[in-house]
Amino acid sequence: MNAFPEDPGGAREEPAREGGDASPSHVTPPGSAGLGSVPNDVLTGPLLEIPRDPAWSGLDVVRLTVLSIVALFVGVFTVLFIAHFWIDPHSPLLSLARIPLVVVAGQALAYLLILGYMVVLVTRERGRPDFLAAIHWNWPTSPAVYLLVGILLSIALQLLASRLPIPKHLPIDTFFRTPAEAWVLAIFSTTLGPLMEELFFRGFLYPSLARGIGLPGAVFLTAAAFALTHGSQLLYSWGPVLVIFLVGMVLTMVRAKTNSVAAGLLIHVAYNGTISTMMFFATDGFRHLEKLNQ
C-alpha cells in the first residue's frame, strides 16, 4: 500500500478485455485510432511540439539562484534604510542590521521579488501561461495526510536531534530574544518561508536536476542544497544540518512520488508549525524565552 495518495493527474493503464486478443497485431497504437477518416493534410502536416518539462533549463535555475541572492541583499538593505531614516535615525546601520525583525522583513520583501520573477520566467520567458501547472503545484486530494506526515516527521526528527551534538548557541537563537520576534518568525516560518523554499527547491531545482542526472541524484542534491542553505543559521554543525538534510530528503521524495509541490508544502508547514507550537508551550506563550536555553 502506498504511503501517499497517487498523483491524481497520472495516467492509468486500462486492463485487457476478458477474452480479448492482446497480441501486437490486434492492438491499436495510441493516437492511431480512426486514422482513415483524418484528412491527408493533417497527417502530412508538421508534428505538434511536445512541451518541454520542466519549461526552464539548468541555466535558468542558476540565473534564478543568482537573482535570488541579489534580491535578498536588495530586500534587506531596503528595509534597513527605511528603518534607519524613518523609524530610528539615531541608530547606526550596523546595529539595525542585527535586529531580527529588520532581517525578516527584508527577507519577506526579497521573497516577493523572487516570486514575481519566477512567474515572469515561466509565463513570459518560457511561454507557459499556467504557472501552477508548469511547476506541478497539483494540490492533493487529501491534504490532511500530508499535514499529519509533517507533524510526525517533526516529532521524530526532534527526538533524533536530542541525541545528536547540537551547539548550545546558534545564530538562529538570536531570532527568539523577545516575544514579538518569536511571533514574527513563527508566522514567517509557516507561511511565506516554506512556500518560497518549496517553489525553489522542489518546484524549480528538483525537476531540472531530475531531467539531467536522474531521480536518485536529483533527490540527494536537492536535499543537500536545501540543508546547506540553512547551514549558516546552524553554524554548519553536522547534527542540526543532518536533521535539515533528512527533512529535505523527505520533502523531495514526496515531490517525486506525488508529482506535487503543494504536497511538500503542506508537510513543510506542518513540520515548522509543530516546532513553533512546541516552543510556544515550552516558553509559556513566548513570554519566557529564556527557557529555550535551559
Residue ranges and their predicted role:
Residues 132-152:
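Interfacial segments of alpha-helical transmembrane regions
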Residues 90-92, 126-130, 143, 178, ...:
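Alpha-helix capping and helix-coil boundary motifs
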